[in-house]
Swiss-Prot record:
Pfam families: SPOUT_MTase (PF02590)
GO molecular function: rRNA (pseudouridine-N3-)-methyltransferase activity
Subcellular location, record wording: Cytoplasm
Keyword S-adenosyl-L-methionine among record annotations: yes
Subunit-structure text: Homodimer.
Keyword Transferase: yes
Lineage of producing organism: Bacteria, Pseudomonadati, Pseudomonadota, Gammaproteobacteria, Enterobacterales
Organism expressing this protein natively: Yersinia enterocolitica serotype O:8 / biotype 1B (strain NCTC 13174 / 8081)
Binding site for S-adenosyl-L-methionine: 73, 104, 123-128
Keyword list, A-Z: Cytoplasm, Methyltransferase, rRNA processing, S-adenosyl-L-methionine, Transferase
Protein known as: Ribosomal RNA large subunit methyltransferase H
Any Gene Ontology CC annotation: cytoplasm
Function according to Swiss-Prot or TrEMBL: Specifically methylates the pseudouridine at position 1915 (m3Psi1915) in 23S rRNA.
Coiled coil: none
EC number of the protein: 2.1.1.177
Length: 156
């Protein structure tokens, strides 16, 4: 199974790149984790936010593999504790499909992305900066993987 993070935004601060790449490199070869960055639409004073969201959504969905399971990252999604996320990761692996995780831009996700999703995952009821979400998702999934393989990274 491959994991794919599809995220709006292409110019992340160095600390985001460093943190994300650190976890990316830790993933085993049988579970590669890739990042696809979608350019954010220009948000000027008179920007048509609805149209920008639609365009970002189209680009995000176009980046997703044909049979991939789509999981959105969204506040109203399901909150998983770490052991629950590990169980979810195991279910995804057993399903045999690749998983695409979608992170929207400043206004969130397009309705088309939400409609295409089989699941929605909430990291927190708090509103989080989108760059930080990349690092949190990578760390959380790595920790979940470590639980499923009895790797010493996760400690109770």
């Amino acid at each position: 199974m491959k994991l794919q993070l599809v995220a709006v935004g292409t110019k992340m601060p160095d600390w985001v790149q460093t943190g994300f790449i650190d976890y990316l490199r830790r993933f085993p070869k049988d579970m590669p984790f890739d990042l696809v960055e979608i350019p954010a639409g220009k948000r000027g004073k008179n920007a048509d936010i609805k149209r920008i969201l639609e365009k970002e959504g189209e680009l995000m969905l176009a980046a997703v593999g044909k049979n991939n399971r789509i999981v959105t990252l969204d506040i109203p999604g399901t909150l998983w504790e770490t052991p629950q996320l590990a169980q979810q990761l195991e279910r995804w692996k057993q399903d045999g499909r690749d998983v695409s995780l979608l992170i929207g831009g400043p206004e969130g996700l397009a309705q088309a992305c939400k409609a295409a999703a089989e699941q929605s995952w909430s990291l927190s009821p708090l509103t989080l900066p989108h760059p930080l979400v990349r690092v949190l998702v990578a760390e959380s999934l790595y920790r979940a993987w470590s639980i499923t393989t009895n790797h010493p990274y996760h400690r109770e």
